[in-house]
A protein has these predicted regions:
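Extended substrate/RNA-proximal surfaces in nucleic-acid metabolism proteins
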Residues: 54-206, 262-286
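An N-terminally biased module of ancient metal coordination in phosphate/nucleic-acid-related enzymes
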Residues: 1-72, 156-159, 170-183, 187-253
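C-terminal active-site subregion of NodB/CE4 polysaccharide deacetylases
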Residues: 239-245, 250-276
Length: 287
């Protein structure tokens, strides 16, 4: 049995490694496949696939998109996306525009308190990256404003806080719909990170399942064993396929390793095969 990681990020969004470097890390970790699930962009997928072909690591083209649920930002993963789909790209372009408008407001609020950044501090070595709160947090650490990325998030970048207004709302059903129309597999990412409580978490998952969502991220670096067991039960009750991944970012989340998370995560390639058959029921069909 092989192992996979179906939730990773590159420097096309808020990861610190290039797509090719990410694939090299996956190879070194002994993984047979990874999904590249950058925020609101498919820009890194082609480079990841090229590196995967060279190294013998399967690359599942993916995406992570943010929506809103009762005042909380939630994330939905798309796996086996078709990145060249014009309708998907138009949707992601709109999502990036919404993100950029929020970024501008974050920068305005921080500047009012004397905190400013250069483009080099934010973009690093990739001028095409999708700027996220993680980029701002890393820049704060580099400037000595905060001692860690976690401190920057807690003090300045908490969702809905003084410096970080919510993004313009996107209904999660709209995200599921665009992913299904694309032929992708849609799954709610890290359900317990939203701190909704069991009842509201179940309600959210049920609502998205009713909208056609096929999966649930049952295994994640942030989960305690009890949480994974609860999610297993929720997924089974709604006939959702489980997925799992580390949510690897590199330096933004230095305690998380690709493939193993904080040390106890292992995702079987059998989960990947179930997902593959869900979106491509005919064996051998290209994704």
């Amino acid at each position: 049995m092989g192992f996979v990681d179906l939730h990773t990020h590159s420097d096309a969004s808020d990861g610190s490694f290039t797509p090719a470097q990410l694939v090299h890390l996956a190879k070194e970790a002994g993984l047979c496949a990874i999904a590249l699930t950058d925020h609101d962009t498919t820009a890194g997928i082609a480079d990841a696939i090229d590196a995967g072909n060279e190294l013998g690591v399967e690359i599942v083209p993916g995406i992570e998109v943010s929506g809103n649920y009762e005042g909380h930002e939630i994330h939905i993963l798309g796996l086996f996306i078709h990145p060249d789909d014009p309708k998907l790209e138009a949707f992601l372009k709109d999502m990036r525009s919404r993100r950029n408008r929020r970024n501008e407001e974050i920068f305005r609020r921080l500047a009012a308190d004397g905190i400013t950044f250069t483009d080099e501090e934010l973009f690093g070595s990739n001028p095409q990256t999708v700027i996220t709160r993680a980029h701002v947090a890393r820049a704060m650490v580099q400037k000595g404003i905060c001692s860690s990325v976690n401190q920057a998030f807690k003090k300045y970048l908490e969702y809905g806080g003084r410096y970080c207004p919510p993004k313009e709302e996107t209904e999660p059903e709209a995200i599921v719909k665009i992913l299904l129309e694309n032929g992708a597999f849609a799954a709610l990412a890290h359900p317990f990170l939203y701190k909704l409580g069991d009842k509201k978490t179940q309600a959210l998952i049920t609502r998205l399942a009713d909208a056609g969502m096929q999966g649930l991220e049952v295994y994640h670096s942030s989960n305690y064993p009890l949480e994974s067991r609860k999610l297993q039960k929720m997924a089974a009750g709604l006939k959702l396929l489980p997925t799992g991944g580390s949510d690897f970012h590199g330096s933004c989340k230095p305690d998380i390793s690709i493939g193993t998370g904080r040390g106890g995560l292992r995702v079987s390639n059998l989960l990947l095969e179930d997902i593959r058959h869900c979106v491509c029921p005919k064996s051998g069909m290209e994704t």
